[in-house]
């Protein structure tokens, strides 16, 4: 069933860890809902800052948010004004003290979330889906990925009937638990309707230090 399950969720505890690092004895549902709202808020606020991951941890009286971004300067703003404003808004949302940490993504072309967003943006600008997929895959392989797979689903090129197109280079072993596979999806809102973009990136095995 490796083909049908989310590669990240399937490997939690083997390769990688959770995006929500906290334990709740009670009120779990409200905290989980709060996490979903915070992630959505951060990604909408910094949609132009290439945010690949938002990790949320909790103390008794504080919420710690680590934002992984390829453009940390865009988030921080001039003299930290932008990040301070966002910090205040989040503090009002959660009624707790908030710590915001920015983690720079040094190789954005290796992150599935950023590749998917980039392809979706190109599709919205009417770039050919084949060209967008091929460019994303080749840029990723140049940075050392061992395999990349991309799929686009919808009314591709304005076709009457929706279909799914795939582009793959290298190997993406979805059934191997030790394989470090990054996965993400994005939506392109085109004039013909929504096109779904999915990206799998295989960087290496965890036992060989693949990151």
Swiss-Prot record:
Xref: SMART domains: KH
UniProt xrefs under CDD domains: KH-II_30S_S3
Single GO molecular function: structural constituent of ribosome
Keywords: Ribonucleoprotein, Ribosomal protein, RNA-binding, rRNA-binding
Protein's GO biological process: translation
Annotated GO CC locations: cytosolic small ribosomal subunit
InterPro entries, sorted: KH_dom, KH_dom-like_a/b, KH_dom_type_2, KH_sf_prok-type, Ribosomal_S3_C_sf, Ribosomal_uS3_bac-typ, Ribosomal_uS3_C, Ribosomal_uS3_CS
All residue ranges annotated as the KH type-2 domain in the record: 38-106
Keyword set includes Methyltransferase: no
Pfam families: KH_2 (PF07650), Ribosomal_S3_C (PF00189)
Family: Belongs to the universal ribosomal protein uS3 family.
Function summary: Binds the lower part of the 30S subunit head. Binds mRNA in the 70S ribosome, positioning it for translation.
Subunit structure: Part of the 30S ribosomal subunit. Forms a tight complex with proteins S10 and S14.
Protein name: Small ribosomal subunit protein uS3
Source organism per UniProt: Anaplasma marginale (strain Florida)
Gene label: rpsC
């Amino acid at each position: 069933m490796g083909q049908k399950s989310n590669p990240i969720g399937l490997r939690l505890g083997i390769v990688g860890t959770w995006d929500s690092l906290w334990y709740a004895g009670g009120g779990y549902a409200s905290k989980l809902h709060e996490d979903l709202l915070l992630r959505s808020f951060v990604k909408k606020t910094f949609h132009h800052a290439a945010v690949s991951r938002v990790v949320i941890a909790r103390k008794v009286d504080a919420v710690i948010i680590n934002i992984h971004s390829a453009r940390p300067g865009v988030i921080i703003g001039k003299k930290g004004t932008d990040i301070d404003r966002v910090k205040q808004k989040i503090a009002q949302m959660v009624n707790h003290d908030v710590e915001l940490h920015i983690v720079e993504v040094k190789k954005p072309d290796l992150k599935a979330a950023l590749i998917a967003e980039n392809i979706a943006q190109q599709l919205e600008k009417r770039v050919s889906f084949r060209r967008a997929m091929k460019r994303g895959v080749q840029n990723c392989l140049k940075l050392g990925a061992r395999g990349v797979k991309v799929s686009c689903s919808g009314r591709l090129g304005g076709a009457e009937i929706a279909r799914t197109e795939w582009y793959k280079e290298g190997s993406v072993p979805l059934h191997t638990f030790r394989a470090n596979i990054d996965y993400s999806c994005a939506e392109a809102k085109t004039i013909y309707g929504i096109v779904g973009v999915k990206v799998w990136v295989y960087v290496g095995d965890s036992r060989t230090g693949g990151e």
